[in-house]
């Protein structure tokens, strides 16, 4: 007997690409890198495998909804009465645990990693860039042959990666660190420490040890600045150093500031021309200029003349700073033209730093501006003349006390009737209005 139910032919294709391959194989299609790609650095650009099953499972939710055939079994005997979707009963603790399951997994993952506790530095103790060691104070070098360097301070000027091509190992990379150390009283040293790749700390420690073995002494004028302006160069780096008065400070390259602090220089101006990124050449040029300078006594002995200072604080009266002792003093007849140079022109090899003139504003040649300058021309020297008269005590200073005394005297003359009292605001007299 034939069945009265209609026959409907359906196709259930549950075999596809995702069913044929396992999870690791599917992840490999996204994370794998070829051998040539690994050599070109593509390994670091690939994303890691994500454990998706730990955070989300198909058909699961905090409400524990049961789908027959998905996350719950199908009861063949009760298919007619069984609901395709039902909510399982849960206690409050189970609901709370299911709601915070993902958060708990993330917290466990974060606590499993070791966090690097970096010491928070004061802004004045930070280096050139963020939390890097370059530019920070590194303390004293290690003792050498029983000699302690407790009063020394070390600075790291540069850390970089260098490479060398060898015929056995190929291209070998190393870490290079430029380190300078000094006691702040003229004794300092610098060196380049090297170590294997990714051993930055080892390279700095090696540089500190080498710098402590290569110390040099720099003569400081008044313990704060250089004796004379000098010019020095190394490769494509040119340095113009100029002495400055007390309290001027350090106005120079950031690397040169650390070198000056290590040596003990407090007041100086240094102009760097050419390459400012080659820190080793910059250091070598500056130190060479410091070592080649001579003191005032050495200059007096070499030239056979008095070294004289003329300061505006003494009204430019000459004061002898150094005199020759072992050399015969020259007379006016034996002086040459080269001996009559100023101290600023005596050194520097005839080189001067480039000083670009200040560019004129766009309105400098306009008609209105020229007309305004011409109207101010008769009063061009009044301010400087007033300052000179006050400085020479030709005119008394118009201070607050002097203005108050003048006001009191005029008030007294007006109250006694010696001077007429002014009528109105800024008017000499008031003219009455005529009657019509």
UniProtKB/Swiss-Prot annotation:
Gene3D superfamilies reported for this sequence:
3.30.160.20, 3.30.230.10
A GO biological process held by the record = translation
S5 DRBM domain boundaries: 152-218
Compartments reported by the entry: Mitochondrion
Keyword list, A-Z = Mitochondrion, Ribonucleoprotein, Ribosomal protein
GO cellular component terms, A-Z: mitochondrial small ribosomal subunit
Any one Pfam family here would be Ribosomal_uS5m_N
Q: Can you name one GO molecular function term for this protein?
A: RNA binding
**Region annotated Disordered, chain positions:** 417-436
Q: What family does the entry list?
A: Belongs to the universal ribosomal protein uS5 family.
Subunit comment: Component of the mitochondrial ribosome small subunit (28S) which comprises a 12S rRNA and about 30 distinct proteins.
What is the protein named?
Answer: Small ribosomal subunit protein uS5m
Species assigned in the record: Caenorhabditis elegans
Recall the taxonomic lineage recorded for the source organism: Eukaryota, Metazoa, Ecdysozoa, Nematoda, Chromadorea
Point out the gene that encodes the protein: mrps-5
């Amino acid at each position: 007997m034939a069945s009265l139910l209609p026959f409907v032919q359906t196709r259930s294709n549950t075999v596809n690409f995702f069913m044929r391959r396992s999870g690791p194989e599917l992840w490999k299609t996204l994370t794998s890198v070829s051998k040539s790609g690994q050599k070109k650095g593509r390994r670091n650009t690939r994303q890691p495998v994500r454990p998706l099953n730990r955070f989300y499972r198909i058909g699961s939710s905090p409400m524990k909804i049961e789908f027959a055939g998905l996350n719950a079994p199908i009861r063949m005997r009760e298919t007619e009465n069984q609901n395709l979707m039902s909510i399982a009963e849960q206690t409050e603790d189970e609901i709370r645990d299911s709601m915070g399951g993902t958060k708990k997994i993330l917290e466990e993952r974060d606590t499993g990693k070791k966090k690097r506790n970096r010491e928070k530095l004061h802004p004045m103790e930070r280096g050139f860039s963020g939390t890097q060691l370059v530019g920070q104070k590194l303390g004293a070098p290690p003792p050498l042959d029983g000699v302690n360097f407790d009063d020394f301070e070390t600075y790291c000027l540069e850390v970089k990666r260098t490479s060398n091509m060898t015929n056995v190992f190929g291209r070998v990379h190393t870490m290079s660190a430029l380190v300078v150390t000094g006691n702040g009283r003229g004794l300092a040293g610098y060196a380049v420490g090297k170590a294997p790749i990714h051993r930055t700390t080892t390279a700095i420690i090696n540089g500190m040890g080498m710098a402590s073995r290569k110390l040099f002494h720099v003569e400081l004028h008044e313990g704060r600045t250089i004796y004379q302006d000098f010019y020095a160069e190394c490769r494509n780096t040119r340095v113009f150093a100029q002495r400055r008065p007390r309290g001027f400070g350090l106005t120079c390259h950031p690397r040169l500031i650390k070198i000056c602090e290590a040596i003990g220089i407090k007041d100086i101006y240094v102009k760097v021309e050419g390459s400012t990124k080659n820190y080793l050449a910059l250091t070598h040029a500056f130190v060479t200029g410091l070592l080649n300078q001579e003191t005032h006594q050495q200059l007096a002995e070499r030239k056979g003349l008095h070294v004289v200072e003329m300061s505006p604080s003494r009204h430019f009266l000459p004061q002898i700073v150094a005199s020759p002792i072992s050399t015969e003093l020259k007379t006016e007849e034996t002086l040459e033209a080269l001996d009559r140079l100023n101290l600023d022109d005596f050194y520097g090899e005839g080189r001067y730093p480039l000083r670009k003139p200040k560019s004129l504003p766009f309105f400098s040649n306009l008609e209105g501006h020229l007309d305004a300058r011409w109207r101010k021309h008769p009063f061009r020297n009044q301010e400087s003349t007033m300052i000179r008269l006050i400085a020479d005590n030709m005119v008394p200073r118009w201070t607050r006390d002097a203005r108050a005394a003048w006001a009191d005297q005029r008030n007294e003359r007006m109250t006694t009737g010696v001077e007429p009292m002014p009528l109105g605001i800024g008017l000499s007299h008031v003219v009455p209005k005529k009657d019509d």
